[in-house]
Each structure stands twice: as C-alpha cells, then as structure tokens.
C-alpha cells in the first residue's frame, strides 16, 4: 500500500504541502487499523480536535487522513484473508482498576514481598534499557523501607546487593541480558553462600550489547545455565504487565524461603506496556516472615 501517496491525496484540500502532509500518514494507517479491528473513530476524532485546538486546519487534516484510511479498508480489494477482525470486550472482575506497566508492577511487587517477609529492600543497579525505570520507581518508595543504589557498573550493583543480603536485607538487582552476563560470578557467590538475591532481567534484543529498544525473550538458557560450576537457581517469568506484580512477590518469597538467588524474567514489551490492573487487597496476602541464621 502506497500510504504516503494516499495520505497526500486525502489532505490535499488543506494545502499543507508535501512535507507536512506526509506527517499525517500515521493517522491514515490508524484509520485502516480501526477498520481492520472494527473500532470506532469518535474518541480519536475528539482527541485530535483537542490536541490541535489552536490549529484547527491541522486537526481536520489528520481527521481526514484517518477517515481516508478507514474508507480504503472498506473499499479496497485486499488480499484474501485480510478483513475485519473483531476483538471481544475484555471480561474484568469487579473491583478498582488502574493502568500499570510491567516495571512499575515489578517494583511494587518487590516492595510488597519484602513487607510480607518483614525485611528491608535494597535495590542496586546500573542504568540499562529497558530496566532503568525499576530504579526510578523504587527510588520513589523509600517510605516503605526501600534503599536504592545506582552503581558505577553491573558488577558493583550485584555485589552491593549480595552484601545487603549478607547484612540482613533482601538484595535485589535489575538489568537486561548483557548485564546478566556480567553479574554471573557474583550470582554464583550468592548461590554458594546461600544468600537470597533477586535478579530482575528485563530482556532485550541480543546478542552482545544488542538492541536496547528491541524486545526478545532469549535469556532463558542464560538465566538457567549461565554460570560456571554447579550453580543452580530458581527462574520465574511474568506473562503480562500486571502479572509482574505477583511474580515479583513470589520471587521474594522463594529467595527468602530457600536462601537462594531467583531470576525474574520480563521483557521490554512487558516493562513498557500497560494494562488495566485490579488493585489487590494487600491485607489478604499471607506474610512469610524471614529468619536469617546467625550461627
């Protein structure tokens, strides 16, 4: 589909010129997607009028491009098998909901888990896409007994977390695939010293430094086997942004129950994607108090 040409034809009456007219092609494509998935255009139309309230000509041009994309879907002879796909309405349990993304849910789950365990939370990390916002979110939660530490590199971050666990807190570190490789030796140290540690691996494209903004789910074997010697640990994976909350809590429970590192696998789509999340009743969660051996 020659989207640029069709967009320029749709916005020609608004005299935007080729450069600015071509910028409306995203709305043309959105109109086609609205047709494909059987969605209404009214909400987007209202939003465009509000967004470009001071420039009504731009608003109308974008709206015209969106309608043109929708009409193209209705009238074009598209390849066999391409047609309207109806997405059923989501079935939600009664309750209070809010939007949540995966990294936010992971941070809250870690805090909730440490509260149920009755131990302070220490989070040491080195900024790395797409895990950086874990540090941002946890830094806002210091009133829940959270300590955050931005280290100079990945190895320093995980070693600080291991030290925090040795001192009676729960050491947690967050990273992506390249960082997990650098942390392997220190994770092995936590395994051999039987210290709890949670490693949040927000996966991205690889190998090596890879592509920070591309998502992959390719770190499973690294998480399970990527250490020298006999160094087994627990590996968990979240399914949705909201699920990150509950899996993070479970990671805390398992790490403190068995005194071992736990790797929590998420990915860039989960970390940055959002979904309606039912706010849980935290009082219904069963505490799992932790006792460190001192002898």
Language model regions located:
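Active-site cofactor/cluster-binding pocket
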Residues: 1-108, 114-117
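Thiamine diphosphate
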Residues: 108, 113, 121, 129-223, ...
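Glycine/charged-rich beta-loop-alpha catalytic/anionic-binding loops adjacent to active sites
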Residues: 7-14, 86-94, 119-120, 139-148, ...
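Gly/Ser/Thr-rich loops at beta-strand to alpha-helix junctions
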Residues: 22, 26, 35-37, 99, ...
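A glycine-rich phosphate-binding loop feature that marks nucleotide/adenosyl-phosphate handling sites
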Residues: 65, 86-90, 127-130, 179, ...
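Conserved anion/nucleotide-ligand pocket segment
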Residues: 37, 242-245, 253-267
